[in-house]
Amino acid sequence: MSSNTVAEFASELKKSPETLLDQLKSAGVSKAAPSDALTESDKQKLLAFLQASHGTATGDRRKITLTKKSTSEIKQADATGKARTIQVEVRKKRTFIKRDDVVEGEGQGAAPEVSAPSAEDQDLARREEEARHQAELIRHQEEELSAARREREERERREREAEERAAAYAAQQAEKKAQESAVREEASREAAAEAAARAAAQAEARAKAEAESKARAAEESARAADLDERRRKALAEAEAIRAMMAAPKKVLVAKKPEEPKPAAKPATAADAKKGTLHKPAATPGARPAAGAPAGGGKEVKSAKLSSSWAGDPAKKKEIKTRGDASGGVGRNNWRSGPRGRRNDRDEQSHQQAAPVEARVIEVHVPETITVAELAHKMSIKASEVIKSLMKMGQMVTINQPLDQDTAMIVVEEMGHKAVVAALDDPEAFTDEDVSGQQAEALPRAPVVTVMGHVDHGKTSLLDYIRRAKVAAGEAGGITQHIGAYHVETPRGIVTFLDTPGHEAFTAMRARGAQATDIVILVVAADDGVMPQTKEAIKHAKAAGVPIVVAITKADKPDANPDRVKQELVAQEVVPEEYGGESPFVPVSSKTGMGIDDLLEQVLLQAEVLELKAPVEAMAKGLVIEAQLDKGRGPVATVLVQSGTLKVGDVVLAGQTSGRVRAMLDENGKATKSAGPSIPVEIQGLSDVPQAGDEFMVLSDERRAREIATYRAGKFRNTKLAKQQAAKLENVFADMTAGEVKNLPIIIKADVQGSQEALAASLLKLSTDEIRVQLVYAGVGGISESDVNLAIASKAIVIGFNVRADAGARKTAEANDVDLHYYNIIYDAVDELKAAMSGMLAPEQREEEIGTAEIRTVFVASKIGTVAGSYVTSGQVTRNCRFRLLRDNVVIYTGEVESVRRLKDDVKEVKEGFECGIKLKNYSDIKEGDQLEFFEIKEIARTL
């Protein structure tokens, strides 16, 4: 008896399983879940219940329609013979009609007798129909299962065939690769043989080329002497022609000269053609000569020129044609083809060009100029300039920019005069604006720069003067920025610039010396003159400013001011008491000793200098420091040197410009204006300027933008030209250099000066084996674009007093980019040095571990030749390396394969014991040979 589940039966009846379960429960069939099995008796009970509930004699359901759909697959061969699987869907629809045999009009009594047999027959027919339906469903399920089984078997068969074909293809490919490798090896051997032959041929060709070059040099020297002689004769002839042109009415007699004309020789023609490169398009005398008859190629030049100088109007009005003007008559008055006419025409051009004197042009060469522009200025073809540069060893294109030095050398080589010029420079207008200002110069406060070695107390000295604690706020207690302050004293205002003393901040100290009037040289009494002290003295002397020496830490017990004076005298800083010009003042930043004397000496020097500057004028000054603030944008600390800077002024600073939106003093308070010698912080520039750039106030914002754009373009072109000039030199250096490891880094700092100093310090760490490669250096926080650049260049990112934003941190974590944060320059340099040390290849050293003497040699089966040895010193270990000495001469170096002691394989044998030693891949040993055993150890290297 067939059975299926409630869910399957519900899907056949197109009902939900829940509805079918309710009907089964009402029919007395206990089924709890859709997965329960249904038997044929359960279905009959359900059918009986439904018939009873709907009634059999009411006639409500007279017609039942059953729809059946089945899907099967058949395999059909197509035209190519391949078997294709076709899906076949069969739909069947059957309608069952219940017929009522009751005849209308018959009596009530007779009706049961007639209708009862009909109802039983109908029930029996219905049950038979349902049984047939169930059987058909079961048969359909069996067909589907068999079709699925056949499909699975067919799929497995196809997979097996595909695997067999793949294995056969792999074997075929392996065989093909083996054949190709054999062919490649044969080709490589042939290529090596060809390379050797080619190298020999090249060596022979080089030797021949050297001999030819020597011969060519001798020939060129002789040709140059001949050329000079011909040029001298041509100049003399040109002078004679000028003299004849002074009297045009005089008829010249045709007379054959004694020596041949310079224009008749090919070499002379080439020289004459070279001389005409600088000649204008039309010159007096050349155009009439072109119209002269060309009939007699051997005629005297004076006879030809006489007709042209006579000024024949018919000759002047003659139309120029592409052919010969003489009607095709050749040199011997015979008609000739196009070749003869061309030679005649060339001869005429040579005769015209010979007496022309080369014109020397004064070429104005800017900082950068392209090859095409340079050729245009010299009135020659660009190909001539390219040839000249190729002779100098530079491969250039017509649009390639040249730096000023290279361009001037080319101009001189071409026989012209080179003049340094900056034409069309919009900065010329700035001088006019400044020179147009007429303002009264008034006394101004001195600008004093405090310089000295690191940790000698510069910032602490300023702390006491300012009554502030600046040094405590600096990272590591060392200054890493230029600090600008102005202090009001009873005798006037003094502006102080505090420069870093660390060796990395050389550029900052140089900027501080250039912007200052007086230098306070700080030297610790207990430390003396140090390297940065000497450097500060050089900067001060180069700037030509007076030096006031402050001997700090004078209250310490181990202070020795006299030693400091002697060391400074050796550096040509002589104290006043020794007859010099520099006052020496011992001071203490803790007790305040000597501070007043120091300020008095500074103000005394300022009075001697008579410092003055205009006040009611547009401001000019110097950019001390610059940074990119996240909230405020580009911020620059500037020192006003003359004039008055106000909020709203248009400022030009280097390659940037902008309008001053806000101005703060050193205490962070807003101010409206700043006079001479006052440091302020300004906002509103278009970009971060370079520290050390000069700034000025202009009246026109448009002009300021133009000048800034011009400066940026000039800087970019100059940089590009210098890079191009250095490329050829670097090619050979890179070819000769070995395998050099690169350590790419990206630097982001809070201010321009710190970024510059950190980059210089890290680049100094480069060695012959490891090179620090600066991918990018900038000012501001670490952004996502910086991290993406680090991903592309595989660089590490160093942040100095800055941090990465959220997006940059997320990108760095996802791509394993190293982000390093520092606030002390010492730490950044030390950690990068340690990282570079880790990149160095370890050093391999040999360490001797023992020696042995071979006393006997025997051959063991399955082992080979064994050295019966006595360990004289140290020990011998398995797999250690050895040197075989015979008569104190090393004849072999190899590895010990095994060591045996009393037929036992051991790891080591110490001094004083005998053992058998098997040498790896070596058997030529004799009695009396010595064995030295050693190990190779790798030792980490440091920078």
UniProtKB/Swiss-Prot annotation:
Domain of life (superkingdom): Bacteria
InterPro entries for the chain: DNA-bd_dom_put_sf, EF-G-like_DII, IF2_assoc_dom_bac, IF2_II, IF2_N, P-loop_NTPase, Small_GTP-bd, T_Tr_GTP-bd_dom
Region described as G2: spans on this chain: 477-481
Residue ranges of the region described as G5: 588-590
Protein's UniProt keywords contain Protein biosynthesis: yes
Record PANTHER family: TR-TYPE G DOMAIN-CONTAINING PROTEIN, TRANSLATION INITIATION FACTOR IF-2-RELATED
Role according to the record: One of the essential components for the initiation of protein synthesis. Protects formylmethionyl-tRNA from spontaneous hydrolysis and promotes its binding to the 30S ribosomal subunits. Also involved in the hydrolysis of GTP during the formation of the 70S ribosomal complex.
Protein name: Translation initiation factor IF-2
The organism of origin for this protein: Paracidovorax citrulli (strain AAC00-1) (Acidovorax citrulli)
Name of encoding gene: infB
